[in-house]
């Protein structure tokens, strides 16, 4: 939901995104395509050390299985790296925090208030425990209206304002990652795309609404706004490449956030080999997509089984689940 609030000269702007559609099943590009394009040569390399905080509802959503939560967060982080590649930005997971016992702030459906509280908590507590550039709160709380995310515009590297909140609104990791990328885009000075903005698709990352067949690329407008943010603010923190000791890892295959040996990867670059389909995901086995119709998520309650499409490593949502609810 679009929101642009200013209270005096010091109050930061806030912008969000609304969710209006079903998820698409288009496969995201492989990690081997991430870096080295001519487009990203327009930007100097930047490194964002990110902390993702999962609220208590996220832990309960996964039946208290912290490994499952951690896996989900890394899947989101991997997708973020793909989306920010054209800007020559590498996302490094500086930390994962899971509120396993209770929420450490009062998470409300009022997105602006939750964002404010999360920013204050980050400044007071999180920065004292772990150095990082940005923090995103992932919550199961239904944010007000159609809002699924909110962030401060231009807040990157500010102790209180380098934050965003994202509702865990989809069972497909890249859809949630697209919302988180949108909020990170706001933190990097990007506004919502107007009708004149183009990324080669109907909807870009900074579109005000998540529409059907959403693109996972930033528009020409977003790239210019990002360049303006860099010129005006010169954020020094995101110039430094983080040490490996400052990152967290997970046994999930395909962790492009930190190099790790894997049979699908080139042993030198740890990028997927050219002839392989995938390196991770519930629909990836032996570096290949599983056959269409393979069950990847067993039915629960009145939900139907979800199946692999044969075109993606993701476990796509069964459309019958949406038609019947």
Curated annotation (Swiss-Prot):
Belongs to the venom metalloproteinase (M12B) family. P-II subfamily. P-IIe sub-subfamily. Expressed by the venom gland. Pfam families: Disintegrin, Reprolysin. Binds 1 zinc ion per subunit. This is Zinc metalloproteinase/disintegrin. CDD domains: ZnMc_adamalysin_II_like. Transmembrane segments: none annotated. Heterodimer of bitisgabonin and gabonin-1 (bitisgabonin-1) or gabonin-2 (bitisgabonin-2); disulfide-linked. The disintegrin belongs to the dimeric disintegrin subfamily. One of its GO terms (molecular function) is metalloendopeptidase activity. PANTHER family: ADAM A DISINTEGRIN AND METALLOPROTEASE DOMAIN, ADAM METALLOPROTEASE. InterPro entries: Disintegrin_CS, Disintegrin_dom, Disintegrin_dom_sf, MetalloPept_cat_dom_sf, Peptidase_M12B, Reprolysin_adamalysin. Residues 46-242 form the Peptidase M12B domain. Its EC number is 3.4.24.-. Keywords: Cell adhesion impairing toxin, Disulfide bond, Hemostasis impairing toxin, Hydrolase, Metal-binding, Metalloprotease, Protease, Pyrrolidone carboxylic acid, Secreted, Toxin, Zinc, Zymogen. It comes from the Eukaryota. One of its GO terms (biological process) is proteolysis. The modification Pyrrolidone carboxylic acid is found at residues 40, 258. Disulfide bonds join 197-221, 199-204, 264-287, 278-284, 283-308, 296-315. Zn(2+) binds at residues 182, 186, 192. GO terms for cellular component: extracellular region. SMART domains: DISIN. The active site is at 183. Residues 250-322 form the Disintegrin domain. PROSITE patterns: ADAM_MEPRO (PS50215), DISINTEGRIN_1 (PS00427), DISINTEGRIN_2 (PS50214), ZINC_PROTEASE (PS00142). A motif (Cell attachment site) lies at residues 300-302.
């Amino acid at each position: 939901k679009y929101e642009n609030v200013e209270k005096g000269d010091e109050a930061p702007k806030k912008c969000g995104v609304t969710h209006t559609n079903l998820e698409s099943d288009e496969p995201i590009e492989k990690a081997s395509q991430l870096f080295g394009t001519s487009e990203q040569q327009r930007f100097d390399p930047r490194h964002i050390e990110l902390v993702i905080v999962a609220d208590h509802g996220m832990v309960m959503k996964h039946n208290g299985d912290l490994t499952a939560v951690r896996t989900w967060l890394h899947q989101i982080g991997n997708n973020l790296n793909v989306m920010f590649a054209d800007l020559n930005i590498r996302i490094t997971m500086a930390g994962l925090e899971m509120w396993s016992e209770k929420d450490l702030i009062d998470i409300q459906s009022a997105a602006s208030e939750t964002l404010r509280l999360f920013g204050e908590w980050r400044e007071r507590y999180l920065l004292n425990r772990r150095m990082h550039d940005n923090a995103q709160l992932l919550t199961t709380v239904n944010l007000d209206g159609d809002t699924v995310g909110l962030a401060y515009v231009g807040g990157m590297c500010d102790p209180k304002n380098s934050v965003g909140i994202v509702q865990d609104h989809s069972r497909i990791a890249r859809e949630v990652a697209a919302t988180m990328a949108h909020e990170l885009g706001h933190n990097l000075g990007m506004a919502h795309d107007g009708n004149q903005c183009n990324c080669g698709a109907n909807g870009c990352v900074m579109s005000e609404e998540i529409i059907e067949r959403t693109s996972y690329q930033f528009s020409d407008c977003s790239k210019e706004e990002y360049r303006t943010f860099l010129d005006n603010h010169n954020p020094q923190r995101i110039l430094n490449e983080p040490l490996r000791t400052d990152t967290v890892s997970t046994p999930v295959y395909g962790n492009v956030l930190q190099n790790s040996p894997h049979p699908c990867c080139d042993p030198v670059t740890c990028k997927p080999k050219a002839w392989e389909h995938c390196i991770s995901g519930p629909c990836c086995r032996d570096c290949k997509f599983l056959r269409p119709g393979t069950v990847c998520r067993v039915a629960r309650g009145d939900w139907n089984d979800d199946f692999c499409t044969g075109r993606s490593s993701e476990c796509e949502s069964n459309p019958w689940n949406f038609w019947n609810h």
